[in-house]
């Protein structure tokens, strides 16, 4: 998944351990500590530091639960996500000869991401959804659809992710087919900037270039733009497994 331009550098984020006494982050005691923190009444420096640490744990726990709830909902009810998981399962059955294989939802995980991105795909590990970056269910639908296109490509075309042309082609397809470049999304991100007539293609190209720039084999933006241009025509027009751009 690509990053949008001009984002700040990665934050120093880490998963916070649960407090020794879970009662301190529940019920009246958590309300009392929150009131104390916000008003400063009776708040010691040590209590302030501990509250901030515990707050991060509570926040990450809530984000994680919401992320998995949204993931499970999309796996049941999103037409794009359901279709893509069906197509991926079909490819897996064809490759293995095992007709009992279903899509493995355990390979879609939620976690905290320091980088300013909403998700990622790793051929060995599966799909990552960034619980602290995804603002709502509908952004997750775009993100999950994007990463599922990468997973489909990995199975269908045996992508070499260190080959810049392979990588660029999959990024073009993922941004084109996921819905992340539809008009409403571009307006949300960029307002009235750019041409609405060419907005979809400009968005797909921009996001593909940014993703390729993140490949360790890519020297700079100029090379990323050149590679995307070289694969553009064939990859933008390749809508498999859809018959056309669905979203």
Swiss-Prot record:
A divalent metal cation binds at residues 146, 150. Pfam families: Peptidase_M76. The active site is at 147. GO terms for cellular component: mitochondrial inner membrane. One of its GO terms (molecular function) is metalloendopeptidase activity. It is an enzyme of class 3 (hydrolase). Its main location: mitochondrion. The keyword Nucleotide-binding does not apply. It is a peripheral membrane protein. InterPro entries: Peptidase_M76_ATP23. Keywords: Hydrolase, Membrane, Metal-binding, Metalloprotease, Mitochondrion, Mitochondrion inner membrane, Protease. Its EC number is 3.4.24.-. The keyword Protease applies. Disulfide bonds: none annotated. GO terms for biological process: mitochondrial protein processing; mitochondrial proton-transporting ATP synthase complex assembly. It is found in: Mitochondrion inner membrane. Belongs to the peptidase M76 family. Has a dual role in the assembly of mitochondrial ATPase. Acts as a protease that removes N-terminal residues of mitochondrial ATPase CF(0) subunit 6 at the intermembrane space side. Also involved in the correct assembly of the membrane-embedded ATPase CF(0) particle, probably mediating association of subunit 6 with the subunit 9 ring. PANTHER family: MITOCHONDRIAL INNER MEMBRANE PROTEASE, MITOCHONDRIAL INNER MEMBRANE PROTEASE ATP23 HOMOLOG. This is Mitochondrial inner membrane protease ATP23. It comes from Eremothecium gossypii (strain ATCC 10895 / CBS 109.51 / FGSC 9923 / NRRL Y-1056) (Yeast).
């Amino acid at each position: 998944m690509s990053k949008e331009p001009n984002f700040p550098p990665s934050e120093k984020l880490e998963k916070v351990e649960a407090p020794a006494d879970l009662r301190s982050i529940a019920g009246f005691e958590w309300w009392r500590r929150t009131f104390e923190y916000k008003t400063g009444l009776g708040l010691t420096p040590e209590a302030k530091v501990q509250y901030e640490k515990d707050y991060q744990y509570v926040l990450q726990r809530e984000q994680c639960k919401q992320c998995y709830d949204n993931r499970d909902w999309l796996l049941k009810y999103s037409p794009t996500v359901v279709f893509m998981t069906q197509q991926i399962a079909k490819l897996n059955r064809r490759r293995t000869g095992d007709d009992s294989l279903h899509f493995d939802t355990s390979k879609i995980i939620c976690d905290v991401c320091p980088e300013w991105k909403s998700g990622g795909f790793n051929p060995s590990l599966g799909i990552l959804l960034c619980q602290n970056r995804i603002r709502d269910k509908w952004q997750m639908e775009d993100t999950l659809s994007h990463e599922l296109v990468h997973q489909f490509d990995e199975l269908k075309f045996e992508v070499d992710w260190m080959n810049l042309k392979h990588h660029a082609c999959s990024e073009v397809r993922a941004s084109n087919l996921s819905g992340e470049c539809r008009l409403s999304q571009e307006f949300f991100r960029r307002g009235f900037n750019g041409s609405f007539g060419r907005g979809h293609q400009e968005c797909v190209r921009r996001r593909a270039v940014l993703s390729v720039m993140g490949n360790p084999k890519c020297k700079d933006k100029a090379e990323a733009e050149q590679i995307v241009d070289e694969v553009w025509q064939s990859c933008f027009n390749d809508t498999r497994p859809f018959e056309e751009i669905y979203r």
